[in-house]
Amino acid sequence: MNSDKAMKGVERAPHRSLFKALGFIDEEMDRPLIGIANSYSELIPGHMNLDKIVKAVKDGIRMAGGVPVEFGTIGVCDGISMNHKGMSYSLPSRQIIADSVEIVAKAHALDGLVLVPNCDKVVPGMLMAAGRVNIPSIVISGGPMLSGRTNGRVTDLNSVFEAVGAVSAGKMSLEELAELENTACPTCGSCSGMFTANSMNCLSEVLGLALPYNGTIPAVFSERLRLAKKAGMKIVELVQKDIRPSDILTEAAFMNAVAMDMALGGSTNSLLHLPAIAYECDVDINFDKINEISEKIPHVCKLSPAGFHHIEDLHMAGGIPAVVNGIIKKGLLNGECMTVTGKTLYENVKDAKIKNIDVIRIDNPYSETGGLSVLRGNLAPDGAIVKKAAVAPEMMQHTGPARVFNSEEEVSKAILGGKINPGDVVVIRYEGPKGGPGMKEMLSPTASLAGMGLDKSVALITDGRFSGATRGASIGHVSPEAAEGGPIGLVEEGDTIEIDIEKKTINLLVPEEKLKNRKPEKVEKPVKGYLNTYRQGVSSACTGAVFHSTKE
């Protein structure tokens, strides 16, 4: 076993002495040493139950004959860090999570890893670590929050963000906002729509690194604890059979994940995270492949923010296995990929049934193409991402005057100050991976537009990114970013921008000769500490905003 490096032989007597200081007995040193990466936090609603998940995982490991050892990782709540400087640290935290899991696993010669994430950057960060470390690994997440009930209406966190705009527009009272604030997030768990955390937790099933139903069992269900025990038992089996992430996280598995992302209408952030995870596994996911898959895969689920259903509805309708089974039967997924169950993807789901055809619409899809698209044009030569599943029909084609801002803070003031008009195209730049730095999410601006009733008449484009809760004609990840000399840095107030989501184009309607004579506005955003380190090392959003320095 890998742990023999730290436990076996005469020269390892000092090492064994330290293990015995931890309370180990000799018999435990002959068993698989399983690390549990626990991102428990009292700052993140989606992570406040992970102590219970980890206890169940430990029970499962011990039942199967392994020895569990728990260690901590950091995490950021994107909702709490939204719309202030804190959001600059969200995406950078993904790198630190991946690095920290790698460091602990390698430094202590672990035999296997149980990864216990739940929220936005923690799931991909841990999956990146699994690909990089490549010892037997399994993911067991904390589970989704239940949706709220506010005066008879089903609500979620996005309802509260949009309500801020509604209050500013005089469409909602402060009393109504307070009622919503108190009821929209009723339990622990990852926020209840098909937002980023739930998108990635669902895709971890499809990638094959999590057990079936990992993405949809609500955080407060006892079923979640039972799944955690099974994950603990399964990791010991994976170690014994030497089944590693490299056996599971293949190119075919990633293509399956992209396809399911399209079928589910997942978060735009998933198209930042999947390439980053693939990078650690030496698999290339580029925007051309993503668009090719998008053209073939029907959009079969429409959860919040695109629709009215939530993750608990998807779970009750049959969960990810039911969706996967339906898509495989249409010949659109590779069912032969290996998974942590030791079985193929199809073997995992072949008996899963759709229990609610209003939630999972395999035979009556919302559209014949996927819920996410990559746009290209002279404004985004390397691509930009839109969640077309959450775009109103009247905004699928839009042409309007540019309203240019160099930070999220500037645009938020303009929106809430009533300075954005129907027909405008809001441009937020210098918020990319390097320019921000940190590539902040723009949920507050998009939610404010929606709450003010402008989501069906105003488009928003940015070299930053969006929350999975964002809806409307919100186009992010514009690449190259302004800080790297991208054309978005040349846009001037009043320029005409043309967007055609169906044709996958985004163009600045300014003559090429005129653009050549423009110089980008110089925007300095000095930072220190980790953000400065991040700015120097991070790559473009179109390649997953990874650190190329992690490769030889």
UniProtKB/Swiss-Prot annotation:
Pathway assigned in UniProt: Amino-acid biosynthesis; L-isoleucine biosynthesis; L-isoleucine from 2-oxobutanoate: step 3/4; Amino-acid biosynthesis; L-valine biosynthesis; L-valine from pyruvate: step 3/4
GO biological process: isoleucine biosynthetic process; L-valine biosynthetic process
Residue numbers bearing the N6-carboxylysine modification: 121
Cofactor comment: Binds 1 [2Fe-2S] cluster per subunit. This cluster acts as a Lewis acid cofactor.
Binding of [2Fe-2S] cluster, residues: 119, 191
Keyword presence, Amino-acid biosynthesis: yes
Cofactor: [2Fe-2S] cluster; Mg(2+)
Matching InterPro entries: Dihydro-acid_dehy_C, DihydroxyA_deHydtase, DiOHA_6PGluconate_deHydtase_CS, ILV_EDD_C, ILV_EDD_N, IlvD/EDD_N
EC number: 4.2.1.9
A single Gene Ontology CC term: cytosol
Residues annotated as binding Mg(2+): 78, 120-121, 441
Reaction it catalyzes: (2R)-2,3-dihydroxy-3-methylbutanoate = 3-methyl-2-oxobutanoate + H2O; (2R,3R)-2,3-dihydroxy-3-methylpentanoate = (S)-3-methyl-2-oxopentanoate + H2O
Any one Gene Ontology molecular-function term assigned to this protein's record: dihydroxy-acid dehydratase activity
Keywords noted in UniProt: 2Fe-2S, Amino-acid biosynthesis, Branched-chain amino acid biosynthesis, Iron, Iron-sulfur, Lyase, Magnesium, Metal-binding
Active site: 467 (proton acceptor)
Subunit description: Homodimer.
Family in the record: Belongs to the IlvD/Edd family.
Function: Functions in the biosynthesis of branched-chain amino acids. Catalyzes the dehydration of (2R,3R)-2,3-dihydroxy-3-methylpentanoate (2,3-dihydroxy-3-methylvalerate) into 2-oxo-3-methylpentanoate (2-oxo-3-methylvalerate) and of (2R)-2,3-dihydroxy-3-methylbutanoate (2,3-dihydroxyisovalerate) into 2-oxo-3-methylbutanoate (2-oxoisovalerate), the penultimate precursor to L-isoleucine and L-valine, respectively.
Protein name per UniProt: Dihydroxy-acid dehydratase
